[in-house]
Amino acid sequence: MARTNPLEKVRNIGIAAHIDAGKTTTTERILFYSGIIHKIGEVHEGTAVTDWMDQERERGITITAAAISTSWKDYQINIIDTPGHVDFTIEVERSMRVLDGVIAVFCSVGGVQPQSETVWRQADRYKVPRIAFINKMDRTGANFYRVHEQMRDRLRANAIAIQLPIGSENDFKGIVDLVRKRAYIYNNDQGTDIQETDIPADLQNQVEEYYTKLVEAVAETDDALMTKYFDGEALTEEEIRSALRQGTIAGTIVPVLCGSAFKNKGVQLMLDAVVDYLPAPTEVPPIQGTLANGDTVERRADDNEPLAALAFKIMADPYGRLTFVRVYSGVLKKGSYVLNATKNKKERISRLVLMKADDRQDVEELRAGDLGAALGLKDTLTGDTITDEGSPVILESLFIPEPVISVAVEPKTKNDMDKLSKALQSLSEEDPTFRVNVDPETNQTVIAGMGELHLEILVDRMLREFKVEANVGAPQVAYRETIRKSVTNVEGKFIRQSGGKGQYGHVVINLEPGEPGTGFEFVSKIVGGVVPKEYIGPAEQGMKESCESGILAGYPLIDVKATLVHGSYHDVDSSEMAFKIAGSMALKEAVLKASPVLLEPMMKVEVEVPEDYIGNVIGDLISRRGQIESQSTEQGLAKVASKVPLATMFGYATDIRSKTQGRGIFTMEFSHYEEVPRSVAETIIAKSKGNA
């Protein structure tokens, strides 16, 4: 089957921003103007196409990344609408991994918010080119120029305006296109009556100022243009457009546009910018992967290359299990057998579909550069690579943040136990930041996630989609343990003699603090066979298992490096089990000697309140063991940035509402792990041992 769109005419883009910047409304308008929907859906009415889960339509927020294919001026545009709430960071993370370009949406009133910075960092991590759309220009307090400056200051982006607004708030009536030096006046709110005119006289000076900045920025991308610019020659529209494209794809320029998606102003011009400035799959660097022998290879966006696709999302569906994939090279065909290279398992593709939110169109194949969904993949999870059997390669997986909050769950009736475990398995397959485990001591099922809202929505989905009513315990903090000093030559010796064959395992280890984020690291420096090779693995396993259950208070031990330096064995009595126990004993002993400490998740908390309430809010954050990092005031609103332990932040949404008469808002996201103060740690440890 021939390709319907040449690869140069494909754009894989995401729409990302902070909560309430208007992402979903922007997506709806794109779909409307590109002809995929015939009636505009509104978030506040609960009719948006990309918000298709019940919880999304009720809450007016986007939770999962909905993938949609549409077209604009002979270009195929695959769009992912991502959530702005920090509890759903994994959805943004996984979409950034498979995109070639991003539209970053900013609110012209709220400006650059904490979540904007998070999304920006994620786009930086995957080097995704982006354009910015300053939305809601019709709102009271709208200020394009302030947000443009915030992008330059707070995001350190080379944000270059390629449009300027004509008026703002109620007087917002059009847009100046700086590249073409033309004005577009919107004569109605449906975006159907647009008049192209000369630039209004009262804007001439401002337009010249920003046009000069634009020309300077594009001249820096190309030596020939720089020479022409210094020689005083004017750059042509085509030269500016071409250099802007080059700079955007290289990540050195972020073109800034403006409009009001809700009032249908600026959306068509934004679609033109997607086509003009964001890259085709052929214009981004080839994806890199690893062969079985450890060598690195590249896979180019080409139908004739071997198949390489990344599974970036799993979704339970009434018709079967949907695996969303980005095809980087080759062709994925319906009915074909493929290899899950990550797990080395053969799988069969039964169906392939292109998505229009919760609607779908069956297709025979997905080609290089396509985003779609496959049915029939039973063992494939988020981050797995799908390849031809003859050309296996493993693509770089996703960065998956660790959960920071957990709650115990149990079904309301014993009969629902099976349904609960099926629901939890299905939900954890969909969402890698959602973890499920059973506490070995209490036998309770514990679920962990990225925040209170995250877990609340998952419990809600258990009821709606799996018909499981669950009792949920109080939230628990995901504490961790680590060590502060190094210790050497710590012994673990397990000997058991009770007639007949005995047990003998003996190891000697050094233990030292590891680099942050390394978890548990093991190195063997055994020489001369004092510990036979077949017993080194079990000794490591014993240490690893001890790390999982912790030493101080039963929390996982992280960022430690154990080195096996010596030991001994018995020809008859030694066994894998004996060395596993010896490894566990050595690690526990070493940790107790290495100044063990408790770590807690610290959250980045930003609060925005009317000035009158700021004193109360700061006092409250300090009483929660918070560290105030910055404070600013703008237009009667005060903003406070702080780092606060998660343990003290449960129920904060209710507290801040009551402290500010409902006028305060806040965002909270995980920042890092930090040592718990001794007095607090003693209470936590005593509680874990049942002494409190």
Swiss-Prot record:
Segments forming domain tr-type G: 8-282
CDD domains xrefs: EF-G, EFG_III, EFG_mtEFG1_IV, EFG_mtEFG_C, EFG_mtEFG_II
Disulfide-linked positions: none
Record SUPFAM superfamilies: EF-G C-terminal domain-like (SSF54980), P-loop containing nucleoside triphosphate hydrolases (SSF52540), Ribosomal protein S5 domain 2-like (SSF54211), Translation proteins (SSF50447)
GO BP terms in the entry: ribosome disassembly
Entries under SMART domains matching the protein: EFG_C, EFG_IV
Subcellular location per the Swiss-Prot or TrEMBL entry: Cytoplasm
Coiled coil, from the record: none
One Pfam family from the record: GTP_EFTU_D2
Residues where GTP binds: 17-24, 81-85, 135-138
Lineage top rank: taxon: Bacteria
InterPro entries referenced in this protein's UniProt entry, alphabetically: EFG_II, EFG_III, EFG_III/V, EFG_IV, EFG_V, EFG_V-like, EFTu-like_2, G_TR_CS
GO molecular function: GTP binding; GTPase activity; translation elongation factor activity
Keywords: Cytoplasm, Elongation factor, GTP-binding, Nucleotide-binding, Protein biosynthesis
Keyword flag Protein transport: no
Annotated Gene Ontology cellular component terms: cytoplasm
Family: Belongs to the TRAFAC class translation factor GTPase superfamily. Classic translation factor GTPase family. EF-G/EF-2 subfamily.
NCBIfam families: EF-G, PRK12740.1-3, PRK12740.1-5, small_GTP
Known function: Catalyzes the GTP-dependent ribosomal translocation step during translation elongation. During this step, the ribosome changes from the pre-translocational (PRE) to the post-translocational (POST) state as the newly formed A-site-bound peptidyl-tRNA and P-site-bound deacylated tRNA move to the P and E sites, respectively. Catalyzes the coordinated movement of the two tRNA molecules, the mRNA and conformational changes in the ribosome.
Protein name: Elongation factor G
Species this protein is from: Trichormus variabilis (strain ATCC 29413 / PCC 7937) (Anabaena variabilis)
Phylogenetic lineage: Bacteria, Bacillati, Cyanobacteriota, Cyanophyceae, Nostocales
